[in-house]
Every structure is written in structure tokens, then in C-alpha cells.
UniProtKB/Swiss-Prot annotation:
<dbReference type="GO" id="GO:0003735">
    <property type="term" value="F:structural constituent of ribosome"/>
</dbReference>
<dbReference type="InterPro" id="IPR018130">
    <property type="entry name" value="Ribosomal_uS2_CS"/>
</dbReference>
<keyword id="KW-0687">Ribonucleoprotein</keyword>
<comment type="similarity">
    <text>Belongs to the universal ribosomal protein uS2 family.</text>
</comment>
<dbReference type="Pfam" id="PF00318">
    <property type="entry name" value="Ribosomal_S2"/>
</dbReference>
<dbReference type="GO" id="GO:0022627">
    <property type="term" value="C:cytosolic small ribosomal subunit"/>
</dbReference>
<dbReference type="InterPro" id="IPR023591">
    <property type="entry name" value="Ribosomal_uS2_flav_dom_sf"/>
</dbReference>
<dbReference type="InterPro" id="IPR001865">
    <property type="entry name" value="Ribosomal_uS2"/>
</dbReference>
<keyword id="KW-0689">Ribosomal protein</keyword>
<dbReference type="InterPro" id="IPR005706">
    <property type="entry name" value="Ribosomal_uS2_bac/mit/plastid"/>
</dbReference>
<protein>
    <recommendedName>
        <fullName>Small ribosomal subunit protein uS2</fullName>
    </recommendedName>
</protein>
<dbReference type="GO" id="GO:0006412">
    <property type="term" value="P:translation"/>
</dbReference>
Amino acid sequence: MPVVTMKQLLEAGVHFGHRTQRWNPKMKPYIYGARKGIYIIDLQKTVKLIDEAYDFVRDVASKGGTILFVGTKKQAQQVVKNEAERCGGFYVNNRWLGGLLTNFQTIQSRIQRLIELEEMEANGELDKLPKKEQSKLRKTLEKLRKNLGGLKNMRGLPDVIFVVDPRKEKIAVEEANYLGIPIVAMVDTNCDPDPIDYVIPSNDDAIRAIALIASKIADAYLEGREGVPYSSEEAAAQPEEKIEEIEINIPEGIGEEEI
């Protein structure tokens, strides 16, 4: 039973890659063709690979493993936060701090500082401090919340990370590779799929595409934790479709890279 339908992927614009001059040749196996200078991702492969990623994340969760969602580009920030919180995962959606995984002990000390400052804010201790010191600590608190707010309860390294745009999140990918942490990622036509353990060929710039794929990864994690299926009934009811049978229109602005 597929986790997602071809129709859902098409409606979310998952099939739109980047302009043909902005591609990574290693993505060739995942490309169906080109329309008006835009690469079209082979959604039949995407459907299959989402299923594989779903099964893997579900199995990690069923064994008590943890998941970290990573997406710092503006289109991904809110989605990554929402889906991580929904499934009980962790997230980084503002800036990846170098050494976040490879120097996790140091990061943990910063997380502890965040927790301490939030406690001071909650019990009114911050308000009792001199104005200058209070202002300084509030700025520190705001910065820590932005960068580490999604990691407050992460006691150790994650068992899997889900990445939106591994090209942008290059440092996160390198750190996970170094530590042997499996990576599930939305990989667009301009990305290198080689460092990714579970490639999901996908438009990684459209909010709807990011929301759809991230929600399926969160569903997989919830299913593993709770033992209750979260995969789409709509997907189960739909007949198998082929991308050759579907008319593809290219909207204005598709394929443009975020500056």
C-alpha cells in the first residue's frame, strides 16, 4: 500500500525540479524528462522511495529511536517545526550550528543554559535583575531559542535525521555521515544524492511539497511509536498511475533557486 498517491505529489508540485542548467548529473536516475527548461522528477520513483523511507523511520521509532528534522530555508522553517512537534521529534529550523552533532557535549551545555534562562524568565528572576544585565540575558535567551529551541529535550544524538535540501544543509549532512547517523532527505535535481541513505526525489523549494513529504515522515515516526497506521487511506484506494499519462504544466517561477 503506497504511503502517498501520484495525485497528491502532483498537486503539491513535488515533480518540479530546477532549471536544466542547474542540475547535478548524479540525479539523472530520478529524472523523468524536461519541460520548458525545467527538469521533471520521476514521481513513480518518488512514490516507491517515500515508501522505503517511511518503513525505515517507522522501524527506528518502533525501537525507541529519535528523529531530528532539519530545514533552515524559509519555506521549510514552519513545516519542520510543526511536524517535529506533532510527532515528538526534534528540529533545527533557524541555523545549523557547526558541531551540533559532532560536538554534541558542547551543544548540550548551551541547551542547558537555554533551559536555565527560560526558568529564570518563568519565575520572574529575570525581571529582578538590573536593566543592563536583564537586556543582555534576554538577547542571549532569544538567540538560544532560535537556534536550539527545537532540541531542548534531546538528550543524545538522534537515530535518524530528516533533511529538507541537503545542498543547503551540507554541514548537517557531513556531520551525520561522519557519525554514521542515517539520513532521509528531500533531494532536488540540483543536489548530490550520494551522501543520503534514503533519497526522496522531490521539489525542495515549494512549501506544499515540503509539507507533504515532511508530514509523511512524521506519520511514519508516529506509527512506529504508537503502533497505529498513519498512512493515507486515499493512497490505498487509488489505482497505480504512470507519469507518462499525466499532463504536466509549468507555472511561472518554477525551478528558480532561492537566493
